Amino acid sequence: MNFPRIVIAGISSSSGKTTISSGITAALTKRGHKVAAYKCGPDYIDPGYLTLAADNPCHNLDSWMLGKDAMTEVFFHGLKNREIALVEGVMGLYDGYSGERPGGSTAEIARLLSAPVILLLNISHMAESAAAIVLGYKNLDPRINIAGVILNQAGSLRHYEICRKAIEKYTSTPVVGYLLRNKELAIPERHLGLKTTSEGGELASFIQNLAAHIESTIDIDRILNIARNAPPLPERPCPYLFPETPARPVTRIAIARDEAFSFYYQANLDMLSDWGAELCYFSPVHDTCLPENIGGIYIGGGFPEIMAAELSANQAMKTALTKAAEDGMPIYAECGGLMYLSEAIEDFDNNKYLMLGLLPGVSVMQKKLHRLGYTRAAVQNDNILSGKGTELRGHIFHWSKLPSPKTKPAYTLLEPAEYAGQNEGFIIGNSTNVLASYLHLHFGTNPDLAKNFIRVSKGFYAI
């Protein structure tokens, strides 16, 4: 199967991947192309920009969490009704799980998808030396097809031309465009990285302005040509994560989505929907009641610490969620969702805001990142998503700390080594119907996660 596709990779973090990937995606969309957008790795924020730019949900591709077949299935799933795929890389091109185990790198994903790569290079502090960097990236792994280069943070057109000529002379790799230094093109950041698209503001106009800049200095037609000359796609895996025909809805699951909670893998939502859950959305910040006739609740991660005052003040929603938990409704809360279920959130300025109180203890924001990285875990006790002994892969990234309450633990961490043996996650409620954890799970690691959540939700309310 032939399908145009391109990977936008950087030589490091902060090389401009999200800015340029979003701009190219928006430029292609503006021209009428239906773009399937993807983000390598476990990040939640960058996909929001790509979703906005493509006007279509972005999927995460993670070969460490999912493995080759599941990751490839997610890729094919995202191609439906699209005509070109754009994949934004993660960190530097070759950065993966570790030096000895390079799984999860942009290079590995590009290789598994047989996709050509456009390499981004920040040239703000170099000239001809840019050629040496590109040459090194090309020679490190000849299996990776670096088909073009984009130069970011050029000081002037003359600066760009010096770098372009050197790269094309010494590497025979075409330079397909550049961006000048321009603070107006910088995406705002906060403690978890870039600001999320769910926080509102003028992001739609920002994306369109970005697309206009991209079109003026980057050769979109040349990028299209590179994408169209990609080799045939690898064989499509047999359906495993998604049913060939979506199941009839058997229950309704409410998804918390607003400025406070927006961290969801699109595949998680699609798997729930395709395996039999009708999804409905609500806002813990703005709504005063839960959607009617629901069998389960999913509260993802996000920035509850930024919206803590508003969450705390919405007593009607807190009461509704507490009652749902006490009534035995299945509730799954990840990271920011876990913080919302705790007694209170203490923000960076030591202000304390009361939350639901389903989970004993106060979630306290730390001055530095508390835990970060890929994680393997074994299920320690049966819960609404998985049975005892199941091994899961996920990702942890949080600045808050919650003293371990005396509740039943959900998981035992196996990896990385510094966390091995630690308990993670909490099972709460008289009927153990609430699961809260800092561990972000991609349901593609095990489709039974989605199926089990649907099963227990149907047990509470069936359509």
From Swiss-Prot:
Top EC category: ligase
Cofactor: Mg(2+)
Active site: 335
UniProt cross-references to Pfam families, sorted A to Z: CbiA, GATase_3
Record-given protein name: Cobyrinate a,c-diamide synthase
UniProt-annotated site: Increases nucleophilicity of active site Cys, residues: 440
Species annotation: Dehalococcoides mccartyi (strain ATCC BAA-2266 / KCTC 15142 / 195) (Dehalococcoides ethenogenes (strain 195))
UniProt xrefs under HAMAP family: CobB_CbiA
Keyword Nucleotide-binding assigned: yes
E.C. number(s) listed in UniProt: 6.3.5.11
Entry annotated with the keyword Membrane: no
Entry-linked InterPro entries: CbiA/CobB_synth, Class_I_gatase-like, CobQ/CobB/MinD/ParA_Nub-bd_dom, GATase_3, P-loop_NTPase
Boundaries of every GATase cobBQ-type domain copy: 252-448
Function field: Catalyzes the ATP-dependent amidation of the two carboxylate groups at positions a and c of cobyrinate, using either L-glutamine or ammonia as the nitrogen source.
Domain notes: Comprises of two domains. The C-terminal domain contains the binding site for glutamine and catalyzes the hydrolysis of this substrate to glutamate and ammonia. The N-terminal domain is anticipated to bind ATP and cobyrinate and catalyzes the ultimate synthesis of the diamide product. The ammonia produced via the glutaminase domain is probably translocated to the adjacent domain via a molecular tunnel, where it reacts with an activated intermediate.
Lineage, highest ranks first: Bacteria, Bacillati, Chloroflexota, Dehalococcoidia, Dehalococcoidales
Note: The a and c carboxylates of cobyrinate are activated for nucleophilic attack via formation of a phosphorylated intermediate by ATP. CbiA catalyzes first the amidation of the c-carboxylate, and then that of the a-carboxylate.
Family: Belongs to the CobB/CbiA family.
